[in-house]
Each structure stands twice: as structure tokens, then as C-alpha cells.
Regions:
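Short connector loops/turns at beta-strand edges and beta->alpha or beta->beta junctions
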Residues: 37-42, 67-71, 202
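Conserved phosphate/anionic-ligand binding catalytic regions in large, soluble enzymes, centered on
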Residues: 3-22, 41, 65, 120-133, ...
Length: 209
């Protein structure tokens, strides 16, 4: 993941491999993986469309991340205005379980991972990716908080937690399929891979970023 130069696709652009390395390897208790599909920015629907049209890329990316960090439980935090896509994500989870890609002893290995969506809440614009942890796990208001502690040491239910955006997790299977170096070559220096953009409203021209 570090070789791929994949950065978080939720806005902050933090290096994904570096973030994953913060998860304590020898922690004796439960650890959690959280996907942030709240997507509250106006005119942004990329995460919704990933769940709608390619949910298995997201689920596979979460499972790969969980395997890399030794995590067995994951949640997808989805905001409450895309009810139809809840059902699509649940269907994809059931399909992945039936195919042996989720649940106990995935593909006959010793690795087990379960994923579920967090029950819907009214829509919030989550400016910090650890806000879903605050809203759902600590029963507090969804607002930025002083750090430390960081989610990797004190996150969901007070346990080590890694949080990534939907698009970030959906890119992970492509990193493994292509290899880190080839994936990195698709993007800019220190910012590998491709990026999804939504073009909305009235526009006159597009320019290269």
C-alpha cells in the first residue's frame, strides 16, 4: 500500500499505507474497521455510486484492509438519504458471504471478517473522518475533537479503529491486482492511482488538475 502512493479519497489525502501502519499489531482485544460513506458535501455522489454500481469493490477493499491490519469486524457508515443503496449494500454483503469472501475462514484460510452497515442517521457533513466514530460508538455529537487520542488508539467503542473513505477502500483491490508500482504510475508523484470526479452544475470548460 505504501508503494502504491494511494492517498485517502475523502478529502484530507492522508497516505493510506501510512495510516494502516498506525494500527497496533499486538493489541489483545477487538479492533475495528470503519468505512465513511456519509458523503455530505453538496453535489458529491461518487461514494453513493460506488455502493450502487460496484459494492463488491468496496467490500473486497475493506476485507483486504482488515486482513492487513488484523481486524475481524468492519462497519460502513452510510447517511440516511440513500435508502435504496442500503439494500444494495446489504445484498452485496450477502453475496460475498455466499461466495466465501466474508464471514468465518474466508476462502478456507484462518482469516475471518464480518462487515455490516451502521444504521442510518440523519445527514451530516462530516468534516473529519473520525466523526462517525464519535456519533455511533461513543454516543457523542458528530463534531471534530481535539487529538490525541487518534482513532488508531481510541476509536469505535474505545478500541483501535481505522477509518477510510468509500473510494479509498474501493481502490484497494486494484492496487493488489496491478501491484503498487504500476498503480502509483497512474497518478502524480506521491499521489498514485486514479480519482473519481463529479461534474455538476453549469460549467464552461474543464482543465487538467
Amino acid at each position: 500500500m505504501k508503494t502504491s502512493s494511494l492517498r485517502g479519497r475523502g478529502g484530507a489525502g492522508f497516505p493510506t499505507g501510512l495510516k494502516w501502519s498506525f494500527m497496533p499489531r499486538q493489541f489483545p482485544g477487538q479492533k475495528y474497521l470503519v468505512c465513511n460513506t456519509d458523503e455530505g458535501e453538496p453535489g458529491t455522489f461518487k461514494d453513493r455510486d460506488i455502493i450502487r454500481y460496484n459494492p463488491h469493490a468496496l467490500i473486497e477493499g475493506m476485507a483486504i484492509g482488515a486482513y492487513a491490519m488484523g481486524i475481524t469486524v468492519g462497519y460502513n457508515y452510510i447517511h440516511g438519504e440513500i435508502w435504496a443503496d442500503y439494500d444494495r449494500f446489504e445484498e452485496a454483503i450477502d453475496e460475498a458471504r455466499a461466495a466465501g469472501m466474508l464471514g468465518d475462514r474466508i476462502l478456507g484460510t484462518d482469516f475471518s471478517f464480518s462487515a455490516a452497515r451502521i444504521p442510518w442517521l440523519r445527514r451530516l457533513h462530516l468534516r473529519r473522518r473520525d466523526c462517525p466514530v464519535g456519533v455511533t460508538g461513543r454516543q457523542k455529537k458528530g463534531q471534530p475533537r481535539f487529538k490525541p487520542p487518534f482513532p488508531a488508539s481510541f476509536g469505535l467503542y474505545g478500541k483501535p479503529t481505522t477509518i477510510n473513505n468509500t473510494e479509498t477502500f474501493a481502490a484497494v483491490p486494484f492496487v493488489l491486482n496491478m501491484g503498487g508500482e504500476k498503480y502509483a504510475a497512474l497518478g502524480k508523484p506521491n499521489n498514485g492511482g486514479t480519482k473519481i470526479f463529479f461534474d455538476v452544475g453549469r460549467r464552461c470548460q474543464a482543465r487538467q488538475l
